[in-house]
Swiss-Prot record:
Pfam families assigned to the protein according to its UniProt record, in alphabetical order: GMPPB_C, NTP_transferase
Taxonomy of the source species: Eukaryota, Fungi, Dikarya, Ascomycota, Taphrinomycotina
Protein name stated in the entry: Probable mannose-1-phosphate guanyltransferase
Localization in the cell: Cytoplasm; Nucleus
Family note: Belongs to the transferase hexapeptide repeat family.
Classification via InterPro entries: GMPPB_C, Mannose-1P_guanyltransferase, NTP_transferase_dom, Nucleotide-diphossugar_trans, Trimer_LpxA-like_sf
A GO molecular-function descriptor: GTP binding
Keyword Nucleus belongs to the record: yes
Amino acid sequence: MISSAVILVGGPSRGTRFRPLSFDVPKPLFKIGGREMIYHHLAALSKIESVKDVFLVGFYDESVFKDFINEVASHFPSFNRIKYLREYNCLGTGGGLYHFRDQILKGHTSNVFVMHADVCCSFPLQELLNVHHEKKALVTLMATKVSKEDASNFGCLVEEPSTGRVLHYVDKPSSYLSNIISCGIYIFDASIFDEIKKAYERRLEEVEKQLRSLDEGMEDYLSLETDVLAPLCSDSSKAIYAYNTPEFWRQIKTAGSAVPANSLYLQKAYHDGTLPKPDTEAEIIQPVFIHPNAIVSKGAKIGPNVSIGARVRIEDGARIRNSIIQEDCEISANAVVLHSILSRHCKIGKWSRVEGSPTLPSQHSTTIMRNSVKVQAITVMGADCIVHDEVRVQNCLVLPHKEIKVGLVGEIVM
């Protein structure tokens, strides 16, 4: 039995809430837990023996993923190929699948894994596949529970408790439906493309009848969740099942959400024994990832839940906790970075503080209330920012190429 896999990577006009981090690196390639966001997906898929072909589907330029694919191909020899399929326009989560259906199904593929790029998860794909085979399902989706307050931000489903059969699905409901949500990870039987074709034909009929007001070029747009899954779940003749994962899961939508995702990936790697031991005499509180090319002085204190990229320089007395430090950053003596993200080429002056507020990995919101105003919990510095000596930046979002000379709290610096 042969399976293929599709990772939906979107495009430059999607994922805008991830700015300013996506200004200098495409969101799917932003490093979390020491590796690119979609590397974690590939690592999980490589453990499924039947998966031979992996397709990245989106509308970025082909050059965006070229170097990444060339690099990771040698990491995953079990794959016959990892290929990027570029949409001619933004086709939606279902439109891209339908457009490239012949390539995805080539080679007598019986099952197709479909995964959104912007999810952080332990990826229990074998368990998902086992349920799919056991139930002889058309679709098996991974589900998890969230708080009632968070539920309306996701695709909510109602399932039959005794069997796990999905009875109803609504994407981002306007009123409370359920606190069981779709994780954005699916296994489809190959016959799903017949259902996607029907959904595509229904959409064309609606366009012809002018039931939808469409922007120019959106005629071929098809949502996997709204146009395909929702109608299927309401059809009692279709076998749609849910696998409820007890393990960690969260979306990576906003820039700040990368910090709790980083913590989850580092903790998993440390627990599994796959986290490389940092080659430094600095004080380390695990879990911590430090790139081998980074220079961390002996007097620094790093961790827990910190990722440090290549060519970073950290001086004596610096303190970093619950943060992501991207490539080529400089953190001067006695500076403090807490609950923050520093994009590439940032410089933090002596005795300065760049800090956010703590967020729980299970907390899906990355904003807090300050003086009755919603502000960023995680401080995010865009690329090439400079914070002068003895300056404090707290709960701020700073766009690239900014020079901070005075203290800031709860600001968006444009």
